[in-house]
């Protein structure tokens, strides 16, 4: 029986178990991820992040993400910031800006001296086939609003892919939003073949929103980086937020800063913090 070193990190309360697969042998497909994620009998986390070397020329690292239920996903914004902080703190790179390969493309995290991390999250995608989403109300491919057919009626959502699928719902007050009830109905809905993250967005001003997110395979979390990006993009497309301005996204775990100009890449800035270092038995 060998030991496996790991680091517990969080980005605004969205917490991660981070494993260095560059300096030690680790195969996530063989790991009991769901057991490790258990908050009473394991390490406890929303997602497992695996740091590996990329085989692609010009790319510094490969970034793999696994939900608490063991399912692999293509992107995680809060995780991307923790990933960048981890490789810098562990001396795996001396670069301030790194090139990181994910299952859904390349991202470019940049570390600031003040502890904040800015990540170029790439371009959002909107085509139903790119979400993926199956329209059932006759909407066109470029619609800003689609209908999700629930037993209680049709729920309007804005669909955005930020490396993973998001459905954004505009609400009057996030504190009163039925996040768990509605999120648990939409997350596995037949119109989202790969399931979906569900965001509940309250407009505070042209440059500020409040947001709660019911994450795919996890449930509601303290913060969701890609969810914050998706919400701001949706708000701009709906004419509710200012394009090209920095939008303050207030989540239960803290605040992120998102900027997007139509047709461009989405920029996300926020903190990443280490909680503790640990070891566990692993064979």
UniProtKB/Swiss-Prot annotation:
Q: Which UniProt keywords apply?
A: Amino-acid biosynthesis, Cytoplasm, Isomerase, Lysine biosynthesis
Question: Which residue windows are transmembrane per the record?
Answer: none
Among the Pfam families in the record, one is: DAP_epimerase
Where does the protein end up?
A: Cytoplasm
Which GO cellular component terms are attached?
cytosol
Q: Where is this site: Could be important to modulate the pK values of the two catalytic cysteine residues?
A: 166, 215
Keyword Membrane set for record: no
Involved pathway(s): Amino-acid biosynthesis; L-lysine biosynthesis via DAP pathway; DL-2,6-diaminopimelate from LL-2,6-diaminopimelate: step 1/1
- What reaction does this catalyse? (2S,6S)-2,6-diaminopimelate = meso-2,6-diaminopimelate
Q: Does the record bear Isomerase in its keywords?
A: yes
Recorded hits in SUPFAM superfamilies, A to Z, give: Diaminopimelate epimerase-like (SSF54506)
Class in the EC hierarchy, top level:
isomerase
GO MF terms listed in the record are: diaminopimelate epimerase activity
Residues engaged in binding substrate = 14, 47, 67, 77-78, 164, 197, 215-216, 225-226
Where's the active site on this chain? 76, 224
Gene Ontology BP annotations = lysine biosynthetic process via diaminopimelate
- Provide the E.C. number(s) assigned to this enzyme: 5.1.1.7
Per its UniProt entry, which superkingdom is the organism in?
A: Bacteria
**Record's subunit section:** Homodimer.
Entry similarity comment: Belongs to the diaminopimelate epimerase family.
Q: What does this protein do?
A: Catalyzes the stereoinversion of LL-2,6-diaminopimelate (L,L-DAP) to meso-diaminopimelate (meso-DAP), a precursor of L-lysine and an essential component of the bacterial peptidoglycan.
Q: What is this protein called?
A: Diaminopimelate epimerase
